[in-house]
Amino acid sequence: MSSGHIVQVIGAVMDVEFPRDSVPKVYDALTIEGKQLVLEVQQQLGDGIVRTIAMGSTDGIKRGLVVENTNKPVSVPVGTKTLGRIMDVLGNPIDEKGPIGEEERWSIHRSAPSYAEQSSSNELLETGIKVIDLVCPFAKGGKVGLFGGAGVGKTVNMMELIRNIAIEHSGYSVFAGVGERTREGNDFYHEMTDSNVIDKVSLVYGQMNEPPGNRLRVALTGLTMAEKFRDEGRDVLFFVDNIYRYTLAGTEVSALLGRMPSAVGYQPTLAEEMGVLQERITSTKTGSITSVQAVYVPADDLTDPSPATTFSHLDATVVLSRDIASLGIYPAIDPLDSTSRQLDPLVIGQEHYDVARGVQMVLQRYKELKDIIAILGMDELSEEDKQTVNRSRKIQRFLSQPFFVAEVFTGSPGKYVSLKDTIRGFKGILDGEFDDLPEQAFYMIGSIDEAVEKAKKL
């Protein structure tokens, strides 16, 4: 084991000098004597000096402290012992339940599966959320992104998906909280405990109050645990909240590492850093990883480099819209902006495809007619257009749905709607079977049968 000493400290970044014949490799983990702090080597600057990122607070660290090289990258516990536990970026338990007792530790830096090992499937994953199952269906072993600005419901949608999929799906899940609020992490833990699925979930948290090193690596820690389950031949669910904070942590340390900023101040290595993470989140012939990632959209601008870089890696994109949220329609998913590779008649069947496209067509037509209605009023429209507007307002309300995870706030019980019922409901509205029902009957309900019941009471 070689040792060196600290020569410079700039926030989360430190330079350490080693003898020239024993310079650590890039990504090696270093430990500081007498301190509970791990450093990760990022660059070799020459003359035996390496530049490192601290995986924790650098308070009280000074020049001259002795640093030991562990000669291996950061490794974390993997396997079934991690289930039901909360860990930090280094795999240390933070739930006060004693040591993890793992049988195996894996390095958080691993190469992505080769092209020959990868596999894809067309099997659909039912979520029980009408708007998702209809217009942007998820594939088993696929990657999904939830895009949205501040406060439109990314985390709530994510929680509902976890609840519906993790409870219906009997496999294991891994949740990585990357740079989000500790309160949300806490709520999530209690939600999982109350639903009795905590013993099937591994939780890894690196929250917003932590140094950038933790937030930059915590996604890799969670991913490593998911990869272990996948390589054992299981179907794993991998949830990340929030991918944007992973990019942001990279931006925070990028300038300190001496790189020139690129577009909008992001790191020049943005696409590569995103690729390193996303290329590993994939399904192989042994097992699958189905991932759901929340992506914060700065200032509601989807062309910002960070969300724009994420788009290209995904199979389905769910876009949350502030305009829809302001109408009081939750989940605030935009059915015209959200897309999925699975929306193909060969994959989902002709009926589902026709209903989904029919819904989008009616909503798009309503969008075009809005200006005319605003200027001239409804009376100036043709009978056909009036019918389209009425149906599209019903569809818009029928796309809303009470969530299980929001029961405490809304007071109305959550609803899980099967794909069959979803298609039947929207098909009925498009075919005019429910033209006589008032539009309020379609708001915040589950299946179409509830609309008929609700209309009787109105």
Swiss-Prot record:
<dbReference type="GO" id="GO:0005524">
    <property type="term" value="F:ATP binding"/>
</dbReference>
<dbReference type="InterPro" id="IPR004100">
    <property type="entry name" value="ATPase_F1/V1/A1_a/bsu_N"/>
</dbReference>
<dbReference type="InterPro" id="IPR000194">
    <property type="entry name" value="ATPase_F1/V1/A1_a/bsu_nucl-bd"/>
</dbReference>
<keyword id="KW-0067">ATP-binding</keyword>
<dbReference type="GO" id="GO:0045259">
    <property type="term" value="C:proton-transporting ATP synthase complex"/>
</dbReference>
<dbReference type="Pfam" id="PF22919">
    <property type="entry name" value="ATP-synt_VA_C"/>
</dbReference>
<dbReference type="InterPro" id="IPR024034">
    <property type="entry name" value="ATPase_F1/V1_b/a_C"/>
</dbReference>
<dbReference type="InterPro" id="IPR050053">
    <property type="entry name" value="ATPase_alpha/beta_chains"/>
</dbReference>
<dbReference type="Pfam" id="PF02874">
    <property type="entry name" value="ATP-synt_ab_N"/>
</dbReference>
<keyword id="KW-1003">Cell membrane</keyword>
<comment type="similarity">
    <text>Belongs to the ATPase alpha/beta chains family.</text>
</comment>
<keyword id="KW-0997">Cell inner membrane</keyword>
<keyword id="KW-0406">Ion transport</keyword>
<keyword id="KW-0813">Transport</keyword>
<keyword id="KW-0066">ATP synthesis</keyword>
<dbReference type="InterPro" id="IPR003593">
    <property type="entry name" value="AAA+_ATPase"/>
</dbReference>
<keyword id="KW-1278">Translocase</keyword>
<comment type="subunit">
    <text>F-type ATPases have 2 components, CF(1) - the catalytic core - and CF(0) - the membrane proton channel. CF(1) has five subunits: alpha(3), beta(3), gamma(1), delta(1), epsilon(1). CF(0) has three main subunits: a(1), b(2) and c(9-12). The alpha and beta chains form an alternating ring which encloses part of the gamma chain. CF(1) is attached to CF(0) by a central stalk formed by the gamma and epsilon chains, while a peripheral stalk is formed by the delta and b chains.</text>
</comment>
<dbReference type="InterPro" id="IPR036121">
    <property type="entry name" value="ATPase_F1/V1/A1_a/bsu_N_sf"/>
</dbReference>
<keyword id="KW-0375">Hydrogen ion transport</keyword>
<dbReference type="InterPro" id="IPR020003">
    <property type="entry name" value="ATPase_a/bsu_AS"/>
</dbReference>
<feature type="binding site">
    <location>
        <begin position="148"/>
        <end position="155"/>
    </location>
    <ligand>
        <name>ATP</name>
    </ligand>
</feature>
<dbReference type="InterPro" id="IPR005722">
    <property type="entry name" value="ATP_synth_F1_bsu"/>
</dbReference>
<dbReference type="GO" id="GO:0005886">
    <property type="term" value="C:plasma membrane"/>
</dbReference>
<comment type="function">
    <text>Produces ATP from ADP in the presence of a proton gradient across the membrane. The catalytic sites are hosted primarily by the beta subunits.</text>
</comment>
<keyword id="KW-0139">CF(1)</keyword>
<dbReference type="InterPro" id="IPR027417">
    <property type="entry name" value="P-loop_NTPase"/>
</dbReference>
<dbReference type="GO" id="GO:0016887">
    <property type="term" value="F:ATP hydrolysis activity"/>
</dbReference>
<keyword id="KW-0547">Nucleotide-binding</keyword>
<protein>
    <recommendedName>
        <fullName>ATP synthase subunit beta 2</fullName>
        <ecNumber>7.1.2.2</ecNumber>
    </recommendedName>
</protein>
<dbReference type="Pfam" id="PF00006">
    <property type="entry name" value="ATP-synt_ab"/>
</dbReference>
<dbReference type="InterPro" id="IPR055190">
    <property type="entry name" value="ATP-synt_VA_C"/>
</dbReference>
<dbReference type="GO" id="GO:0046933">
    <property type="term" value="F:proton-transporting ATP synthase activity, rotational mechanism"/>
</dbReference>
<keyword id="KW-0472">Membrane</keyword>
